[in-house]
Design a protein with these regions (language model features):
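N-terminal subdomain of nucleotide-sugar transferases
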Residues: 1-35, 40-47, 141
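A short, histidine- and acid-enriched strand-loop-helix "catalytic/donor-clamping" loop
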Residues: 100, 106-125, 141
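A short, charged, and often flexible helix/loop element on the N-terminal side
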Residues: 43-71
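Histidine-centered beta-alpha loop that forms part of the nucleotide-sugar donor binding/catalytic region
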Residues: 1, 114-117, 167-168
């Protein structure tokens, strides 16, 4: 996920925390600890993606570093499923990780959750559109955070996969009394 306050970072982090409370082991793999991930525990781990500076590259290849880190984490922790949030670069790097793992006889299903600007802004740009289209179609499962985004995705890209809508969520148990006071 993107480790920021944006939708992909928040949804991915909250989903991971919820799954960890149900006993699942969760691994976040990104360039910075997600802002909503306040604590790590035995079943919540963060793996930093480091991108070494190399003067040959004008732009450092984050996708290569991410896909390599995913392979390492999968092998070291026996990951069952890869759930990537935000089509580019995460679904693309996830696909590359799947291919590298397949070389070692490891099959890993990948789920891609689409969040919005990865489709309507960044993804639809002519430079990225072929890679986004490819990555979505190579995902084993594709979800969208809204029906509207699903429709946009199907209109912008040539998607062969079924896209399931799983709406963003708000855990009302986390809302404080001060929120209710503001409503008066």
């Amino acid at each position: 996920c993107c480790p920021t306050f944006g939708g992909s970072g928040v949804v991915a982090t909250e989903l991971g925390i919820s799954l960890s409370k149900r006993g699942h082991e969760i691994h976040f793999v990104t360039y910075k600890q997600p802002v909503r991930l306040e604590y790590l525990s035995n079943n919540i781990r963060y793996h930093e993606v480091l991108v070494p500076e190399y003067p040959l590259f004008h732009y450092q290849p984050y996708e290569l570093a991410l896909s390599s880190k995913l392979v390492t984490v999968v092998k070291n922790h026996k990951i069952d499923v890869l759930h990537v949030h935000y089509a580019i670069p995460h679904a693309y790097a996830g696909f590359m990780a799947q291919q590298m793992l397949a070389e070692d006889g490891i099959s890993l299903p990948m789920m891609t959750t689409l969040h919005g600007t990865d489709i309507t802004l960044v993804g639809s740009h002519s430079f990225y559109k072929p890679a986004v289209n490819f990555s979505i179609n190579r995902s084993d499962v594709v979800t969208s955070v809204s029906e509207s985004l699903k429709k946009d995705t199907l209109n912008i890209f040539d998607i062969k996969k079924d896209i399931k809508v799983v709406p963003n969520f708000i855990d009302i148990a986390n809302l404080s009394q001060s929120f209710e006071d503001c409503q008066r």
